UniProtKB/Swiss-Prot annotation:
Location of the protein in the cell: Cytoplasm
Domain S1-like: start-end pairs: 1-72
Family note: Belongs to the IF-1 family.
Keyword Cytoplasm: yes
Protein role: One of the essential components for the initiation of protein synthesis. Stabilizes the binding of IF-2 and IF-3 on the 30S subunit to which N-formylmethionyl-tRNA(fMet) subsequently binds. Helps modulate mRNA selection, yielding the 30S pre-initiation complex (PIC). Upon addition of the 50S ribosomal subunit IF-1, IF-2 and IF-3 are released leaving the mature 70S translation initiation complex.
Keyword presence, rRNA-binding: yes
PROSITE patterns the record matches: S1_IF1_TYPE
Chief place of localization: cytoplasm
CDD domains linked: S1_IF1 (cd04451)
Subunit structure comment from the entry: Component of the 30S ribosomal translation pre-initiation complex which assembles on the 30S ribosome in the order IF-2 and IF-3, IF-1 and N-formylmethionyl-tRNA(fMet); mRNA recruitment can occur at any time during PIC assembly.
InterPro entries per UniProt: NA-bd_OB-fold, RNA-binding_domain_S1_IF1, TIF_IF1
Chain's gene name: infA2
Full protein name: Translation initiation factor IF-1 2
GO cellular component assignments: cytosol
Length: 85
């Protein structure tokens, strides 16, 4: 399937499920099950309940999707608390 056929929607994470999956409530009121995309998993971008996310979905299965972007939330600017590795 070509990337041009994907639907991109905005939503909010409302539940954390096992195996790296999330329950996402979309802006249009539908609820889907989504997983994190490869780049988000590679760079260990964490998502929690209440985060605004951008989800890609195929038109063939409108109950599943892939989280491709997590909206940045303020409060992590200069002088913030840093965690050591």
């Amino acid at each position: 399937m070509a990337k041009e056929d994907l639907l991109t929607l905005e939503g909010v994470i409302d539940e954390i499920l096992p195996d790296g999956r999330f329950g996402v409530m979309l802006e249009n009121g539908h609820r889907i099950i989504a997983y994190t995309a490869g780049k988000m998993r590679k760079f260990r971008i964490r998502s929690i309940v209440g985060d605004s996310v951008r989800v890609e979905m195929t038109p063939y299965d409108l109950t599943k999707g892939r989280i491709v972007y997590r909206e940045k939330v303020g409060g992590g600017g200069p002088g913030g608390v840093r965690r050591r590795r």
